[in-house]
Amino acid sequence: MTTSIKTNIRFQLGIIFSCAAFFLIASDSRAADSSAQPVDLTGKYPVPISVLTNGNWLALKTMPVGHQIFHHVPLEIGGEIHLWGEGKGTNHYSSYPEKVSDIAVNRKFEALYVYHGSYYKSPDGTPVFKVVLRYEDGSSATNTLSFGADILDWMVSPNEAPLRTPYATNSEIAWVGGQFSDTQKNRLRFCLTALNNPHPDRTVSTIDLISCKTRTIPFVLAMTTGPAGLLNDNAAKH
């Protein structure tokens, strides 16, 4: 068997295994909750969906985009919102900001579901970024997502067995699959975190995303508001 044929077979097997991994994760999710509503991030994505789907980087071409449902939560994945981290300050599209402000919401909800990934590892428990809910009455509430508890590196290490999952009870693996590049066969991993709104009776006007300026670079792909407890039916934590 020639080298080129062997290479082609290995590539096809890699795609098959990636698709299988995607199916296993996605099959855990039942129908989306009808009261959950994706947040429109269209004007906030510095990396738009066209880059994710039409670029040359295999990782971006093999990750899920558009309408997706993970763990009962409907998501609209239209790009990536990166925040600054010490691992790398810029990419080849734009600078990573320390803060992304005034994401319009204008509704009441019990929980905010954040679909995210990250580059560069930090020690477990390291704060990575904050999600600030700004209410119509001028008050605010802040949640902090930390490495290990909520956030994991988006590249799955080749020797990572079993698959590492977030250890916080309000965070889950949402999707695993794809492939980092033609030469690096690492699968990709994204997490989903449920942030309970301490004041569900108040209208949330906007949301801010703020970097904690540690080594890890977080990125948010989608957010959805809805009832609390959508992740509660999933498998127990390891």
Regions found by a protein language model. Name each.
Residues 30-238:
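N-terminal/edge-of-domain interface segments
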Residues 1-11:
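N-terminal secretory signal peptides that target proteins for export/translocation
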